[in-house]
């Protein structure tokens, strides 16, 4: 069953189109991430879902019911859309206690006090905040304040929650833990979550599917984490998801070269995925592998230890490229240092037509 449907939604500010012909269905109980660079329209899309921004055209449905349709003159008011929202900056009211913050949506609905207390207790239990009912926000850490914000969203709606950059303001360790907590909570409750972020790693870790938007607000790809990483739809997606190396490539007399300041051999038979015509290769740093029998030669210019991996920078054909090697792989006894001549084997590369500049 589809929980949310955007049908050909176009959004604009002052005549400037931000999102054009946006179509997306979100299933009941699914976590869908909307990911893209700053200014691509991610937040505008969920503002439209919440009733805070009217589309120029298109329709929005929740549980099969129209929430917005300009053609049919339907526009359900924000307070009647029954959607929970979690913002980046916690947005807990500093003058209200934890229980008052969480119970505020229920108070607005004029529920009986005992029912409010019951639902507040239940929501705080879902986010491991029981015992903090009388605390003020100033007495809480950033992670605890965000848990309060999530609990408040649950009292607004356990069925559908929007999370807009909910972990951006937390430190790295708290971010990791909060993602796990959000997933466990969602599994317990069956909540449908639309997760807005520019953090690709967080979206891929948390979400069942991810929607990739480009700078123009167009959908480039919708897929699982594996689909997006293993089969990026285009060059933008490849570049946007993780670190990448890009370089022009050519074929000459049945051999394949990196077309740099000088041509550098990398394959002596047709590579998988090769396309005819001017092309560029995209390759991840982990897929450029040190191999004494590799066809590609370069000079190691820098080795940087990052704890769980090494970053290596290798100059090939006049340009510098990044390689990555896990610390475990580096336990083979082979040490690589600046100034070494190295040979490489390239795997899992992707090919894209060269963009023509007007």
For each of these PLM feature ranges, what is it?
Residues 35-37:
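The feature captures the beta-strand-to-loop junction immediately N-terminal to the Walker
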Residues 43-46, 148:
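ABC ATPase nucleotide-binding domain helices that frame the ATP-binding cleft
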Residues 50:
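Helix-to-loop junction immediately C-terminal to a conserved catalytic motif
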Residues 58-70:
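Conserved ABC transporter NBD signature motif
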Residues 82-84, 88, 95-236:
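ABC ATPase nucleotide-binding domains
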Residues 244, 255-358:
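Non-catalytic connector elements of ABC transporters
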């Amino acid at each position: 069953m589809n929980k949310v449907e955007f049908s050909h939604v176009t959004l604009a500010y002052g005549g400037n189109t931000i999102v054009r012909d946006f179509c997306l269905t979100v299933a009941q109980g699914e976590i869908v991430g909307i990911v893209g660079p700053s200014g691509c329209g991610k937040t505008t899309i969920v503002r439209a879902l919440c009733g805070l921004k009217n589309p120029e055209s298109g329709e929005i449905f929740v549980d099969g019911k129209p929430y917005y349709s300009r053609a049919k003159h339907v526009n359900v008011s924000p307070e009647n859309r029954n959607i929970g929202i979690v913002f980046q900056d916690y947005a807990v009211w500093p003058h209200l206690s934890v229980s008052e913050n969480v119970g505020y949506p229920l108070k607005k609905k004029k529920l009986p006090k005992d029912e409010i207390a019951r639902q507040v207790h239940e929501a705080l239990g879902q986010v491991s905040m029981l015992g903090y009912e009388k605390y003020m926000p100033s007495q809480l850490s950033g992670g605890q304040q965000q848990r309060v914000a999530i609990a408040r969203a649950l009292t607004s709606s356990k069925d559908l929650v929007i999370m807009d950059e909910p972990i951006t303001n937390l430190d790295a360790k708290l971010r990791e833990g909060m993602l796990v907590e959000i997933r466990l909570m969602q599994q317990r409750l069956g909540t449908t979550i639309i997760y807005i972020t520019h953090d690709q790693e967080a979206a891929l870790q948390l979400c069942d599917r991810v929607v990739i938007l480009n700078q123009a607000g167009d959908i480039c790809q919708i897929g699982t984490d594996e689909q997006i990483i293993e089969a990026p739809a285009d060059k933008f997606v490849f570049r946007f998801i993780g670190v990448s190396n890009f370089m022009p490539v050519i074929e000459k007399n049945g051999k394949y070269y990196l077309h740099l300041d000088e041509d550098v051999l990398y394959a002596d038979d047709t590579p998988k995925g090769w396309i005819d015509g001017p092309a560029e290769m995209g390759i991840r740093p982990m897929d450029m592998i040190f191999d004494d029998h590799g066809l590609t030669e370069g000079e190691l210019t820098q080795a940087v230890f990052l704890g769980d991996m090494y970053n290596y920078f290798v100059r090939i054909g006049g340009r510098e490229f990044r390689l990555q090697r896990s610390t475990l792989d580096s336990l083979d006894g082979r040490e690589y240092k600046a100034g070494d001549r190295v040979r490489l084997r390239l795997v899992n590369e992707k090919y894209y037509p060269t963009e023509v500049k007007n």
